[in-house]
Amino acid sequence: MTTTAASGKRLALVDCNNFFCSCERVFDPSLIGVPVVVLSNNDGCIISRSEEAKALGIPMGAPLHQQQEVIRRHGVRVFSSNYTLYGDMSARVMSILRDAVPAIEVYSIDEAFLELPPAFEEENARELRGKILQWTGIPVCIGIARTKLLAKFANRHAKKNKQMTGGVFDFSTYWDPESLMVDAPCDALWGVAKNTARDLSKIGIRTVLEFQHADPTAVRRSLGVVGERLHRELNGISCLELEEMPPPRKGVMASRSFGSPIEKIEDLEEALANHVARASAKVRRFGLLATHLEIFLQTNRFRKEDPQYHPSIGMTLPTPNASTSELIATARELLQSIYRPGYRYKKIGVMLAHLVSEEEYQPSLFTAPVKGKIDIDKIVDEINRRLGDPKNPLVTRASMGTANSGTKWRMKAERHSPNYTTNWNELPVVTG
């Protein structure tokens, strides 16, 4: 179901501030006011920074090893990414938003577009921001406008000027909107990448205001239909619909780099089984079935001294499937066909693709029955959702190993915070 922001309607973009760092701070007050960074998979690069860390000049995406001196000198607190915690905190924020407005599009783990009711004023947005902070501990900024593009731009202004805006800015009622556009570069706009900005500069468009006033024909000639749509959005004409339900997925991938290089096929099989289990659970959650399965292996491209090998292989499944056990068996057969000894493998992954709706699929009398196995898997999914830890599910298959096995292939997460909200054994303890 989609909702178009028709004339007269307004949208809001709610964006959680420095989301991963904010989640860590909710349960550890000692982090408030000190620089905090969160790392990517395998503790490789910095993917979230508190305002204090940004002030130290720590760049987004910087490899951790390049920032060790700054971290040591300024006492920066460093955390491995805890996606279990972040996903749960995101769900709590989105639940509050759903109760506040007629329609919501969850755009990412830390962003959502809202369709606002007619009587929704800037003061209501401030109350909503306060409620989210009080109920979850997560600070957000809210930008309000007539279109998605302008709501994003309004949110940018709210965030960059928090002392003046208080984290909320309504572009649709601002008395001098052009003053915000006159010095803003085109790549400050949502959907305008660096190369798009370069194309615009070739036709004399360098600022957001110049883009807004540009000749639509020239924009379309330079950037095509996508550029024309952005231009219309910038002029308050809604072209991008609010998607209350995400479009059907074309595929689900699960892959991770290993904590240490892997050479034995037994370790690769265990890692692959875990990835297939995660991907198939996600496919089932969306009520879908996979008709194609593909796996790939990679050595470390950056270790030039190591022999390189990056094979992949796929196959169309005999029948659409979401059974973990059957998909693991198929994936292991494919792995056997591409595995070569003598290589130091860095990554393995699986893609479940060409997805079809479980409700629409009519199994042939001549295909192997899979519905019973999928139904059992769904029961396991529910048990793991209620009682397990997403990183270490309560119910697994023998081929997936245990939490204590696979120490080589499991990701590095040496600075991992507890799963405060999803694991009974890791609940925060309050002492008097």
For each of these PLM feature ranges, what is it?
Residues E121-E123, N161, K304, V356-Q362:
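Short, charged/polar, Gly/Pro-enriched secondary-structure boundary elements
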Residues T4, A188, T196-Y345, E360-Q362, ...:
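DNA-contacting surface of Y-family translesion DNA polymerases
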Residues E115-P117, Q298, P318, A353:
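Solvent-exposed residues in well-ordered beta-strands and their adjoining turns
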Residues E326, R332-V395:
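C-terminal hydrophobic structural anchor segments
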Residues A145-T147, Q298, M351-L355, M400:
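Short loop/turn motifs enriched for small/polar and acidic residues
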Residues M1-N235, C239-L242, A281, V370-G432:
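Gly/Gly-Pro- and Ser/Thr-rich, intrinsically disordered tail segments characteristic of DNA damage-repair
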Residues F113, T316, G349:
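Short aromatic/hydrophobic contact patches that present stacked aromatics
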Residues P139-C141, E294, K347-G349:
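Residues at or immediately flanking beta-strands
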